[in-house]
A protein has these predicted regions:
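A cross-family phosphate/adenosyl-ligand binding-site feature
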Residues: 1-97, 101-175
Length: 175
């Protein structure tokens, strides 16, 4: 297993997990796209960022009396890129962090990015999202398939996702 991750305090003791550290969206894109041809399943747990500075600074930007305008550009969409290049024998799982029109946006991403499953993380749900140890997700699959899950620990949510991937492989996916 290759775990491509930005800066983290995770301690990985398992000998079969290879941590690939990255610090920028461009490094993440490079790490994912160069390894993707050799994987059976890719789980894209989060977008790096939707936007990145046009001119990144390597030092602190000092406060200016006249104000400051930060110019941003869209980052490369890594999930869309691997969805575009995936083979029929590969599975790609994406995630959608949404606040409005959540189900519609998640299903649109599933199709436009050519994903096999997408995990909807709706930030408007109580107990879901960031700053909590719980989550409530809906997993969508192609052909209008869906699986709704109750609020539970994020560890159990991860197990649900793995189970849905297993069902997809076996041809009995609920999502």
């Amino acid at each position: 297993v290759d775990l491509i991750s930005g800066p983290t305090a995770l301690y990985l003791a398992h000998p079969r997990i290879n941590l690939v550290p990255v610090t920028t969206a461009a490094e993440m894109y490079q790490a994912v796209t160069t390894r993707f041809q050799d994987v059976d399943i890719a789980v894209m747990t989060a977008a790096v960022a939707d936007y990145t500075p046009v001119e990144p600074e390597d030092q602190k930007i000092k406060r200016k009396v006249t104000g400051f305008t930060l110019q941003l550009k869209a980052t490369l969409d890594i999930a869309a890129e691997i969805g575009r290049t995936k083979r029929n024998d590969q599975i790609v799982v994406g995630f959608a962090l949404e606040t409005d029109h959540a189900e519609e946006n998640a299903q649109k991403k599933l199709l436009t990015k050519n994903l096999d499953l997408i995990v909807l993380n709706n930030l408007t749900e109580p107990g879901a999202g960031f700053r909590t140890d719980t989550n409530r997700v809906t997993i969508f699959g192609k052909g209008n398939k869906r699986a709704d899950f109750q609020l539970k620990s994020k560890e159990l949510v991860a197990e649900d996702i793995v189970e849905e991937v297993y069902h997809l492989i076996r041809g009995i996916s609920h999502a």
